[in-house]
Regions:
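Acidic anion/phosphate-binding donor-loop and adjacent secondary structure
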Residues: 92-94, 125, 139-157
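Membrane-proximal helix-turn-helix segments that form the acceptor-binding/catalytic region
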Residues: 95-113
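A short, active-site helix/loop in glycosyltransferases that binds the activated sugar's phosphate group
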Residues: 108-134, 142
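Conserved donor-binding/catalytic core segment of Leloir-type glycosyltransferases
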Residues: 114, 151-181
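A charged, aromatic-enriched C-terminal amphipathic alpha-helix characteristic of glycosyltransferases
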Residues: 168, 265, 269-273, 282-318
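Aromatic "clamp/platform" in nucleotide-sugar-dependent glycosyltransferases that forms part
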Residues: 225
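Short hydrophobic beta-strand element within catalytic cores of glycosyltransferases
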Residues: 242-246, 252
Length: 322
């Protein structure tokens, strides 16, 4: 199959630094190639260039991985689907203009949607009026070979909060937790709130640091007030770490597993409760590292693509909902 993937166009693919969507696109493209498919990555902000590149490649399927470009959907003459990675897609009242700029376009165009979670698909069904036959669950995957793995972590007594430090991730709420360490670039929205002089702030990790050092921590913490299907959780699992997330970060995780902990939103300001939950999860995670590494295989990109993306692409190509 010949597949075109459209990226945001603002950061190179693969990215040199941070860029979750760009990493996802790159790793997905490499897995597709390993499965025998031809892949074109289009990464430009010029809509005319996008359409021209698609037509030149003449793909069997087009996957728009940046929801702002849903407006191009009617102009793409090939079977197509759109994915949103917007962190507040399930909380449109917090959208900051997203609803009018992007979501209402979905309601008008009613494209095929590759949604990252069941909750996201429900939003498109109930609020955008997109028919169920146009909605497909397609979780993100991860490249399992990227991360170093150890059964004896150097910092097993520490938890790592690995994310851009901003208002959505809320890191400043948890800085008094002594065993919680933070890595990520600081967004202006957190300046004055997040104490970057703290010994627990590790600065912004390079890709090499991320791939080499993540496995040396006991577990991952991600307590955002909005997420879609966060890549960092799968990266943590692939490095052998359990995860502590909010209700917004639990998409596609097996909540029956002891090393996956969900903090209820109504308890997010109870720092003592959060700290105890993080420590308890860390202790369980250290005892279950082999099991975590085995579970992470469920998110291997080749497995995810074969189970979800390729069958749904074929259904759309066959005319079920073009």
């Amino acid at each position: 199959m010949r597949i075109s993937i459209i990226g945001p166009g603002y950061t190179q693919i693969p990215p040199v630094g941070w860029g979750a969507v760009e990493i996802l696109i790159w790793d997905m493209s490499q897995a597709l190639k390993q499965l025998g498919h031809e892949v074109q990555i289009i990464n430009t902000v010029n809509p005319n260039e996008m359409i021209a590149n698609i037509n030149q490649f003449s793909p069997d399927f087009v996957h728009i991985q940046y929801d702002d470009y849903v407006v191009l959907y009617p102009y793409i003459q090939y079977p197509c689907a759109v994915t949103s990675h917007f962190g507040y897609i399930e909380q449109l009242h917090r959208d900051g203009g997203y609803k009018q700029r992007v979501f209402d376009q979905f309601a008008s165009i009613k494209p095929n949607v590759f949604g990252l979670s069941e909750g996201i698909l429900d939003v498109y069904k109930n609020l955008a009026g997109i028919p169920e036959e146009n909605l497909f669950l397609t979780p993100n995957g991860v490249n399992l070979d990227t991360f170093r793995k150890t059964l004896d972590p150097k910092h097993g007594d520490r938890s790592i909060y690995l994310a851009k430090i901003d208002h959505r991730k809320r890191q400043w709420l948890f800085q008094r937790i002594s065993s919680l360490y933070f890595a990520g670039n600081i967004d202006p929205s957190s300046q004055g709130r997040f104490d970057e002089t703290s010994k627990n702030y590790l600065g912004e990790w390079s890709k090499k640091q991320l791939h080499q050092e993540l496995t040396d921590y006991g577990n991952l913490v991600l307590l955002s007030d909005g997420e879609a299907h966060p890549l960092v959780c799968m990266e943590a699992l692939s490095a052998g770490l359990g995860v502590v997330v909010t209700e917004w970060g639990k998409a596609n995780l097996d909540l029956s597993r002891d090393y996956i902990t969900v903090i209820p939103e109504w308890r997010i300001n109870d720092t003592d409760y959060v700290e105890k939950s993080i420590i308890a999860n860390r202790e369980v995670s250290l005892q279950n590292r082999k099991n975590i590494l085995e579970y992470s295989k469920d998110f291997d990109w080749k497995k995810v693509i074969s189970k979800y993306h390729l069958p749904y692409m074929q259904k759309i190509i066959n005319g079920r909902s073009i």
